[in-house]
Amino acid sequence: MFTLPPLFTTWWGSVTRASDVSLGWVTTCAVLASGLLTYVAGIVRQQLGTRWMYVVATALMLVSLAVVLADPRSLPMAYVWALLSGASSAFTYSPSLTAVQEWFPRRVGLVTGLVNASFALPAAVAAPVVAGMLRNWGFTATVFALVVAVAVTQMVVIFLSTPHWLEKKRAEGLAFARREISAPSVTTAQAVRTAAFWQVWAIWFAGGGAAITMMTFAATYSAHLNDIGVRVSAVAAVTAFVSGNGLIRVVNAMVLDRIGPTVIGCVTSAALVLGYVLLGFVASGWALIVVAFLAGVALGTIFTISPLLLTPIFGIKNFGPIFG
């Protein structure tokens, strides 16, 4: 979700010579599908459970990669890939957050932070690796390798997705803690009529939008800098973004239960604002990399603080649909 859209977009730009606007729709399609289907994923997970959500997500991932293999140089196919890729992310992320809060209801900050980190840190590692594969192997071989990697890793995830050992070992304590954290039990319809819900929504709309724009902006602005004689690699900017996105989730996992989400959210939002201000005055490759890193930090923070802002108020029972 965080690595492939900007890297694939750069490759499609080189082979299709499409405009920045047309290429920008690749990331937009991925984000739209992920955002719109997170709500659906939350509802479906209540009926099917976490394991079947992972099965659906795996199927969507593999189909998305098959689509671009069918016609690698087609921009419409790229849009279809992005929509399917974003959908697979939605069917993985929201169910995972809900599941770990149910399993470890008294360590919500830690476990949701670790789940967030597990989504973002591999992206930081994968960015230079996938970029190297695209450069040395070509697009088709890279996608085939990704198909194999997705199939193998997702089979392991599906197998491990229901921790029966945890249920048996801690059944009594889990039951009490779940009743405690589920006490509010607010429905989605009730949640959207509260000020707290719209405050969190505003954080996502403004802060999340500003941060995730960097997924497209990193490639287009680096191209602009190269055009005016400032040498900078789009891969370096993307790597900075996904690194900030991953590292801050690890930090947040360690400190959220002690510091709380409000302070962390304010600090990272202020840092992102200052970063974008800097970028408006400094035409530098290093400035782009720093701001890309800060955008990743802000996005990772929004992801990790949201459960701590929502669950204590609305409960865990309908967390998936409310978060979506």
Locations of regions flagged by a protein language model:
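Extracytoplasmic
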Residues: M1-D20, L37-A41, A126-A127, M214-A219
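Residue-level signature of mid-helix packing/kink "hotspots" within the transmembrane helices
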Residues: T3, V31-Y39, A124, V242-V250, ...
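Extracytoplasmic gate region of multi-pass secondary transporters
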Residues: L4-W12, A189-M254
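Helix-to-loop junctions at the C-terminal end of transmembrane segments
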Residues: L37-T50, I248-G260
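C-terminal ends and interior cores of transmembrane alpha-helices
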Residues: A59-R73, A271-A283
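Intracellular juxtamembrane helix-capping segments at the cytosolic ends
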Residues: F91-F104, V111, T301-F314
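Helix-loop-helix hairpin linking two adjacent transmembrane segments in secondary transporters
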Residues: S118-L166
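C-terminal transmembrane helical hairpin of 12-TM major facilitator-type secondary transporters
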Residues: W204, I212-T213, S233-L309
